[in-house]
Amino acid sequence: MAPHILSAVTGNSVDVIKPVRALISVSDKTGIVELATYLSSIGCELLSTGGTAAKIREAGLVCKDVAEHTKSPECLDGRVKTLHPKIHGGLLAVRGNEKHEKDMKDNDIGVIDMTILNLYPFEATVAKGSPFEMCVENIDIGGPSMLRSTAKNHAYTTIVTSPSQYAELTDTMKSNEGGTTLALRKRFAARAYATSAAYDSSIASYFASQLDSEAPVAARVYQPEYPLKYGCNPQQKPAGISSILGSPLPFSVVNGKPGYINLLDAANAWQLVKELKEATGLAAATSFKHVSPAGAALAVPLSSSECQAFEISETDAASLTPSALAYIRARNADPMCSFGDFAAISDIVDEGTALYLKKEVSDGIIAAGYTPEALEILKQKKKGNFIILEATPDFVPPSMEYREVFGMAFSQKRNSIIVSADHMKESVTKRTVDDDVKRDMILGCITLKYTQSNSVGFGKNGQMVGIGAGQQSRVDCVKLAGRKVATFMLRQHPQVLGLNFKAGVKRQDRVNARVRYIEGDFTTEERVRWEANFEVVPEPLTSDTKEAYMKELSGVILSSDAFFPFRDGIDHASKLATKRGNIAERMQQRAHPSREEDGGINGIPILFRMRHFLEFKVIW
C-alpha cells in the first residue's frame, strides 16, 4: 500500500519577516544577553523558561515565562514545559492561510517567529561517565520538538541552534530593518535538521552501547569548515574539511591556507607528540611528510658529535628550550626527507624554536600554542603563507572512527591505547632494562602507531634514527630503516663532519651532499655536480671505513608495528651493530619463528610489552 503523502499548505509568500515574538531556551548562554537585548530593541517580545529567563531578566530586559504564555505550568520535574499547542501552534501556523488564521484565533494562539535554543547536553553527560539514568534524563524532548516545528515552517519562522549563528543573524536583521530573510531561514533550518540528526544519532549510539547486540545504523553529520584548493591531487576538486557536528575541530588555523595533505599530516603529527608528552613527560616533536613521520624525538640533550652533525654549536645547544631541542632532534633524524615537512610540537613554541624553524624549509606547524614573539617570526615564513595551526585544548576525539572508501563506510573503535612504561614490565630475557631504553621503546611504539604500515623503526637517545614505512614485507621495512640508521650514524663520522663546503652552499644542499657522500653511488654527471659543493673534493668514504665505524653502534632499540613472522627481520637488524645490548621491541606477544629459548637473537634481547595482542598498524 502506497504511503499517504501530505499536500503542501499554502500561505503568503514573504522574504523578509520581522519577528514579533521569540522563544529562547538555551543551556549554553554564551552571547544570549546581547542577542536578547537586540531583539528587545526592535520590539520583539521575549518568551523563555527557567534559567534562561532569569539570565535575561538580570540584564534588565522584560521576559515572559512560557508557563504564563501557555497558561499551563511546568510539570513532571520540568519534563513538560513547551509541549503545548500555544507553542507549537505559534511556530507551525502558515501565515496568510485562512484556516490556520481561524484556528489560531479560536484557540487564542499567537505567532512565534523565532526560536533560539540549545539541546540538553546529552553527549557531555555521557562523556563524563554519568549513570545510565542521568544520561536518559539529559535527553531533550521539548527542544528537538521546537527545533523541528520552527525549521519546518522556515518560510515564516527562524530557528537558531548555536551561539556561532548569532552574529550572522543580527547582521542580517540589521541589514533588513530588523527582519530575517528567507535565504537565512532556509540555511538555518538545514543546520537545525543536521543538529537534530547528530543529536539523535548520539542517543542511538549510546543506547546501542548499553546492549549486547550490534550497533544500529549510525548517522554522521558533517559541518563544512574550510574549503581547500584541492584534495590529494590537483584534479580532485572540490575539496574541504568538515567538523563532526557537535564537536569542534581539533585545531584552529592561525595563519596560512592549509591543504588536504597538510591537514592529514597535522592531525596525525599532533596525536603523536601529544601522546609522547603524556607517556614520557618530555617535550616531543615530529617532522611529518605524506602522512608518516620522517623523524620524531624527545627533548634529550645533544651529544658533541650530534651538535656537529646538526650544525649547532655546543654553546647554543646548552641553552635550547625543550621545544627547540625536541624539534631539532626530530628534524635531524632524516633531514633529507624532512625537507618541506609539517612540524608538530607538544609544548608552547618559543622564540628560540621559531628562529630555528625559520631557517628550515617547512610547510607548516601544529603546536599547543605560541609565544607572541614566536608567532611573529613564523608568520614571516614563506612570504606570510607559512601554515600555523594551534591545537584545541582538551579536545577529545570520538570513540569511533569512520572512513569512506569506494562507496563504503568502514568503522572501528579508535586506537586510544597510549603506550607507557607500564607496558614494558615483562621481558623474555633476564637483562635489566634501564629507563633510557624504556623511554626510547615508548618513543618507538608511539611513533609507529602513526606511521604507515608495515613499519619498523630504530631509536636512540630519545630520537627515531631510522623509520621504514609502508612496505609490504616487514624485512624490507627493517632494511629501509636500517639504511637510515647507518646514514644517521655516519653523518657523525669524522670524515663527514670534516667536509669542506664552499661558501654560499645552502643548508639543505649541505645535508643532501653529506647523505650522497655516505651512499657513494654516484653517476658520472651527478659526481660532477656533487664535487662542485666543496673547496677540496673529499676522499671517498670506503666500505671498510663505514663498516668499522658502524661496529661501534650500540644502544639502539628496534620497534615494529606488528609481530615479525620470520626471524629474517631480526637477523638483518643485528647486522647494523655487533655490540650486545641492543633492544628488539615487538608490538605484541605471540609465538613465532624468531623466538629463541634464551629470548634473544644474535645478542638482541626481545622484550614483550603486553600479555594481550597489541598492534599499531596504520593504513590510509
Show the residue positions of the predicted features:
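Mobile "lid/hinge" segments at catalytic clefts and subdomain interfaces of large enzymes
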Residues: M146, N153-L169
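ATP-dependent carboxylate/acyl-activation modules
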Residues: A2-L23, K29, C75-G78, D113-Y120, ...
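Short acidic-hydrophobic, aromatic-tinged amphipathic segments that line or gate anion-handling sites
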Residues: K64-A67, T158-S162, L607-F608
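Short, hydrophobic/aliphatic alpha-helical segments
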Residues: V33-S40, Y120-I139, S145, A269-E278, ...
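Non-catalytic interaction/clamp surfaces of large macromolecular machines
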Residues: P163-S164, E168-K229
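Glycine-rich nucleotide/cofactor/substrate-binding loop typically near the N-terminus or early
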Residues: G51-F122
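N-terminal glycine-/serine-/threonine-rich phosphate-binding loop
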Residues: A2-H69
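Active-site/ligand-binding-proximal alpha/beta "capping" segment
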Residues: V94-A151, S427-D435
